[in-house]
């Protein structure tokens, strides 16, 4: 008798994706982040569902309802902090996952990569709207500042902003629609992640060497299931430590002050995972220019397959490209730091230089280094 997992219509899909999937024998721990992102998404959907049971999306009661969750709901504080810090873990895994893709040339799977870029935008939109929901000072002013950026779009900008707001300022209508979108988007993300996997399994996984691994495949289970479980345990331990020991470490104290349209906080800044993009936005004195730079700072990832000039796929055997890659990582840390600083000297000039370096590395220096390495191969 044939095994049920190979004949049952539903089990067959699970089997070909997670059990009998042929995987390269040499993929490292950098390939763990896909499964970790799946775990993060499931965690966010579950904790979010329980939070939504107690949350009210009304400007008068939103802040109080979050306080009520933390004080009165059984383990409400745990659910709330798991959700808030789960978002941080989600972004850490996302950045590492994208970084792995850049380093090992995974962007050469174009469909998978482009769905991934789309997923990144969707997760960023979801996180932004989620940050607005507690209706603290930073929620309100963050929503005001970021939505206002759309007014930089010529001709239709102002109308577009008022349409998104549902009025002439960020108010009840804005909060209600943000809650609705924040609830639905994770399910769209889950569907997109399914498409992401579908395209990945059309080609098979990349591996650290960047060479074809068709001659040396091993089944996903038990080798990589056990490896993913180890990664999951590390993720859960890190998240638990953060939630139970310092749940507010990555948050903003201003968000414990109820939203007040008459009082602007001294430093308006988003959550830490948006700071690099926020620094790029602020480094350009022109509003439209800043918005374009902000969007392009993420959209530039979609250009990666076209900017690949090397004869080798992976950076594993390309020392010059490796140096530039780690310079890019250092530059992103610098941008993240600058995004959290006030707009004053010397932070302005550091931010501008870091922004120029960011685009220069991706658009010019890395493709040029690859061409140089191609010539070194002839020696």
Curated annotation (Swiss-Prot):
List of residues binding heme b b562: 83, 182
Subcellular location: Mitochondrion inner membrane
GO cellular component: a single term: mitochondrial inner membrane
Binding locations of a ubiquinone: 201
Membrane topology note: Multi-pass membrane protein
Biological process terms in GO annotation: mitochondrial electron transport, ubiquinol to cytochrome c
Coiled coil regions in record: none
Cofactor: heme b
TM spans (from-to): 33-53, 77-98, 113-133, 178-198, 226-246, 288-308, 320-340, 347-367
Cofactor note (record): Binds 2 heme b groups non-covalently.
PROSITE patterns: CYTB_CTER, CYTB_NTER
Role this protein plays: Component of the ubiquinol-cytochrome c reductase complex (complex III or cytochrome b-c1 complex) that is part of the mitochondrial respiratory chain. The b-c1 complex mediates electron transfer from ubiquinol to cytochrome c. Contributes to the generation of a proton gradient across the mitochondrial membrane that is then used for ATP synthesis.
Protein name as annotated: Cytochrome b
Organism: Talpa europaea (European mole)
Gene from which this protein is expressed: MT-CYB
